[in-house]
Amino acid sequence: MTSPLAKGLEGTGNWVDDRIGGARYIRKSLNKVFPDHWSFMLGEICLYSFIILLLSGTYLTLFYDPSTREVIYNGSYVPLRGVSMSQAYESTLRISFDVRGGLIMRQIHHWAALLFMASIVVHLARVFFTGAFRKPRELNWLLGVGLLVLGLVEGFAGYSLPDDLLSGTGLRISYGIALSVPVVGTWAAFLIFGGEFPGANIIDRLYPIHILLVPGIILALITGHLALVWYQKHTQFAGPGRTEGNVVGSRIYPAYAAKAGGFFFLVFAVMAAMGGLAQINPIWLYGPYNPSQVSAGSQPDWYIGFLDGSTRLMPNWEIHALGHTLSFNVLFPTVLLPGILFTLLALYPFLEARFTGDRSFHNLLDRPRNVPFRTGLGAMAIAFYVILIIAGGNDIIASVFHVSINTITYTLRAGIFLIPPLVFWITKRVCLSLQHSDEELLHHGVESGTIRRLPSGEFVEETVALPVPYRILMTGVERDDQPALAGADGHTGPGYGEQYEVTGSSTKPRGFFREKRSNGSTAAPRPESTLPELEGSVD
C-alpha cells in the first residue's frame, strides 16, 4: 500500500518531469559506467578534499576578522596576554583557544589544503604517465594544470591570513619577488600591498581572494573538468572486453554511488583524525608578525617549497645598467622558472602530438613502460622537483647533520644539472628492459613447474601460455586465434611470439618516438579516426 508521502513525492516528480522532461536523462545517467581501477580514485580525493575545504572554511569565516588594526590581546593564551597584535592574528588565536571546535576546524582546513594539492599533483602524474591527456582530452589537461596553479595561489593566500611571524615572513618574500620584476614591479608591489611593506591593506585584499575569488574559479574549473569527463567518457586500462569504444566498470547507481559515498566519508574521517591528533601551524608559538624579527628554520607548505629551494640555489647574480638594478637572483627562480615550467606542463600534450605525429583519439591508457621517453621525462621532472624541495631545507639539513650549508648548496647546484638527466636515462633503460621482459613472456609463456625429458636426453621445463588478461594488458588487444610457436628442439613454449599483428594498429610494445627495443623497427602511427561513440558496459 502506497503511503501518502510516497504519493505526494510521485505526484511532484511527475509534475516537474512534465515541464522539464528530465526523467529520461536521469534514467540514462544512472546507467553510466565508471572504471573500477584504484588510480581513478586520485581525482576523487581532490574533489572530496575541496568539499572539506569549503565546509571548514565557511565555519572559520564566521569568526575570522581580516583587519590589520592593532589591538591588545587579552584572550585565553596566557603567554601572549598584553601583547600588541593585529586584529587578524587576535581573531585567529580566538578561533584556536576560545571558539568551540575552532582549533580542530583550523587544523582540518590546513590538512585538507595539503591533501588537495597532493591529490592534484598525484592525479596529474597518473594522467601524464598513462597518456590520459592525449586527444581528445587536451582541454581537461589544461584545466588540471590551471587547478594546480590556482591551488598554489589559494594556499599561499590562506597561509598568509593569520598574520603570524611565519606567514608575515612569506608576505615579505612575496613583496621582494614583486619588486624584482622589471619596469612594473615597483608599481605592482605598491598596488598589491597598499604602500611600503607591510602595507595597510594586504590582509584585507587577500581575504576576499582566498574565500571568494579563487575558490569560485576553482569550483568552475572542477565543474568543467567533471563535465568533460562525463561527456567524453572515462579512459581505462587495456583488459578483457575493453576497447577504444566502450567503458567496462560499475554503473553510477547503485554500485559506484555507494563506493564514492563511502570513500568521501573515509577521506573526511582521515582529515578529522589528523586535525584532532596531528598539530599543524601552531601560530601561537610564532607570535604576531614583526618586520624586525625573522624566525630561523622557517619552512613553507610543501607545494611552495620548490620556489624556496630554487631561490636558495640561485647564485647572487644582479645586473646594474642605466641606473637600474635587475635582481636576476630573485626574478629567475621565483618568476621566470615557474612560468617556464608551468607553460611546458600545459603545452606537453600538444608537443608530444607534434613530435610523434599522433593525431588519433585515445580511450585506452598506456602502460608507462611502453612509452619510455615520456616516462623518463616524468621521472626527470620529479627528480628536479625533489632536489628543489631538499634545497629549500638546506639550513635545517646543515643544522641537523652538522654539515656546511655552503657544501650542501654547491652539491645541490651541481645535482640540479646532473641528477635529472641521469634519472631520465635510467628510467628509460628500465622501461625498455621491462618491454624486453614482456616480450619474453609473450614469446615463451610462463613457467609451469613441469619438467619434460627430450628425446636427446635433455631435461627442459614446460611453459604455458600467458593468461589472457595479462596478454591483453601487454599488447592492448584481445585475440584468441594467435598460434603457439612451434620448435623442433622442444625449447619453445606455447607463447605468442612476434606474430600478434592487428589491422590498423601496432600491438607490439613500443616506446615514445616510435621506439622499439627488440629490433629497432618503427611502428606506424595509428590512422586518423573520429571519436567513437562509447557505450558503457559492466564487467
Regions found by a protein language model. Give the residues of each.
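Membrane-interface amphipathic/re-entrant loop segments adjacent to transmembrane helices
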Residues: 313-330
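Membrane-embedded alpha-helical bundles that constitute the cytochrome b-like, heme-associated redox core
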Residues: 1-313, 332-539
